[in-house]
């Protein structure tokens, strides 16, 4: 399985791809929010071993990821969006548990 994490920002997106075994495929691919940038991502996704599942994830920003979502849907890629507030609460809650145990 491939895990694709995309950092969403106002002017560009940054992509990280790894396998379930921890092999890094792409460490920091900067994608412009243009057709060319999205095609760069699509070509990278298509170059991956198609026998493996691809899991694409990013934080929901409300607006900045809209073009990316439409592009992924149009090209038959599913994705998961995470609420950044919930992610932050989850992380801080788990870090608290670790601190308490130590």
Question: Model regions: which residues?
Answer:
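Phosphate- and other anionic-substrate recognition elements at nucleic-acid/protein interfaces
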Residues: 1-102
């Amino acid at each position: 399985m491939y895990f694709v994490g995309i950092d969403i920002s106002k002017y560009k997106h940054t992509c990280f791809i790894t396998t379930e075994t921890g092999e890094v495929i792409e460490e920091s691919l900067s994608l412009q929010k243009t057709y060319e940038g999205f095609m760069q991502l699509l070509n990278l996704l298509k170059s991956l071993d198609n026998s493996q599942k691809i899991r694409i994830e990013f934080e929901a920003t409300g607006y900045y990821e809209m073009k990316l979502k439409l592009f992924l849907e149009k090209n038959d890629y599913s994705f998961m969006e995470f609420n950044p507030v919930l992610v932050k609460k989850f992380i801080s809650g788990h870090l608290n548990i670790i601190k308490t145990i130590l």
